[in-house]
Amino acid sequence: EVIKIEPLYGELARTLPLQREGRSGYFVQHNIGKKTMAIDISSKEGQDICHGLIKQADVVVENFAPGVMKHNNLDWETLKAINPDLIMCSISCFGQDGPLANLPGFDWIGQSYAGIIDLLGKKDDTPIFGDFAFGDVATGAHAYGAIVTALMHRMRGGSGQHIDISLIEVLFSFHELSVQLFDSTGGQMLPTRAGPDHYLLAGAGIFKCQDRYLFIVGLNQWLGLTRAMG
């Protein structure tokens, strides 16, 4: 059972287009199967309701800016005193501590700080951002893996724990080539935007054909690729 806590006026996503039969398709897509409760967590009554739910909860997931949960008596120290076996996962842009922790942020902000957007687009043109929230999605997947691991730890006799997941750490891990190339060459090799091509690998890119675009990766199949091309 998953219970989503929303403000009294409802989550903003409920208003997003497109609407069908009075419901947002976006909201339904991301919340299907969840139960919802509208609670004013800034009030004593609302906090008491949340504390009651915590007593029987296995997992709490929150994505407020760091400090908001503590301000509303819903921080880890408070909740683990109520339920020592609780698994709590806090998701934020920059993590729960550090020099950027108090800054708010969302997917595209995280992509910018992590250097993702700087590598998207044509070499001498403006960087671009994709119309996909892959930072949000990937961070959710990382959180899922961490939560399941924490639950397994608890099943084997461990205690509850607080998990800190940040968008910027997840997005930075996307640099499967960039970071190690820069580091191993002493900064001599700088990843660059390359448009439809790859800045390092030959035989990988997007090519315009007669009726559509074709993406080719022929790294270990170069001879086969050239034969297929005639």
Please state what every model-predicted region is.
Residues 1-159, 190:
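N-terminal helix-loop segment corresponding to the beta1-alpha1 unit
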